[in-house]
Amino acid sequence: IKTIGSVAGRMHTGRSRNDLANTVNRMFYRDQINRTIEALVALRAAVVAKAADNVDTVMVVYTHRKEAQPITLGHYLMAISESLQKSIDRYEQLYVRMNQNPLGSGAAAGTGWPLDRERTAALLGFDGMVVDTVEGTAGWDHIMEFASDNAIYLSGLGRLASEIQLWSTDEYRSAELDPAFAGTSSLMP
């Protein structure tokens, strides 16, 4: 810096766009995972509270669109709660695998600069390091895993939404949707 001046501070000493991009990406996704976990924990608490309010509310569970057995609404909602907990578990497991520092991987084969990767991991809030430098720059599977976890979680919510919609039909008449959440036909009654 003394010889070159302030421009020297812009040198990519010991780092590459490859490891920088993966580092920033992992920091972004760990935030998304934490936000998702927080939302799921709150949703699960609300579902459990609603289940507790309905331990004696009898309903029919259907299989293949046929009445099968009597259960309680509380029992049904606890199934939703269990599905939410499995999603929380998946996100927490992903967080552990994903929150590893790739910085210092360089372009792919590391760097000759004496970087303290453990220190950068600690400073950036990572729990550890991606040990293999090629994986540190080429490993992007955490994005696909996050998308997969989202799809699994949202399919569970989709099941709930679909069943509530079905229960609100004239054939079932088990639930009533607030008009703000229901659509109507412009032609049919």
Give short role names for the model-derived ranges.
Residues L124-P189:
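Acidic, glycine-rich loop-and-beta core segments that form the ion-binding/anion-interacting portion
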